[in-house]
Amino acid sequence: MSAYGAIPREPVDLQPSRIYALKKRSDGEQSHTHMVCVHLRKDDIPNALEEAMRTSYNETLIEGSTYPFRDPMDKDAFQSYFFGYDVVVGVLVNASGQQYQDGSEVSLAELLGQGASTASRHDLLGKAQWPQQLGGFYYVKPNYPGRSSHICNAGFIVPTSSRGLGLGGLLGRSYLIYGPAFGYLASVFNLVYLTNLASAKIWERLGFEVVGRVPKAGLLRVPGTDKEEYVDALVIYKEFAPH
């Protein structure tokens, strides 16, 4: 839900899945080699995956440093907020010995060991291991209604157990493909808190620009304490390349 209420939008066709190589861990322990970004809608998401997503999202809310919401969301609230439009989920897979170009289209069935299966995305993802294979996820929705609905907004989550592996950057790269594929011409992030350095660096690296700053936009938790402090937020924008 945006500040403008529910924004009507025609659903788009499900887009192809895309693959990205994970950076190699320095300790040599790596059970997954790639992340497959999969376009989904509410009915495509099996219960175990939804629960893993909601758990990760609520852990992020409890941290109190990146999203404005104070309290964890129950199932209905999470579905309403996250699944109203389009969702992209990063699925961790082991594709060692195979060569893929980052961002290329792939068969989800083959990467999940189902061969040339014609099963639905819901059924395929139901065979994966959650939360072990959850690399991250994000929603994409219109930021404004009507005459400005060509500009979208997205919200990204990387599970705490998967941070530091560069997954946020891979999700961001996929967003540059999926955003215009969903029919949007540009993206805006309304609240990138100054303390969220990882996010700001990702968007700068991907060619986004800071177009505004909101003073004292968030009353955020101070890490390692019970205190809170006001933090400014950046407004970050990018026009998508033509799809």
Task: Indicate residue ranges for each PLM-predicted region.
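Alpha-helical interaction/dimerization surfaces of two-component signaling modules
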Residues: 56-59, 178, 202, 206
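Conserved acyl-CoA
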Residues: 170-187, 209
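Acetyl-CoA-dependent GNAT
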Residues: 65-163, 172-173, 178, 239-241
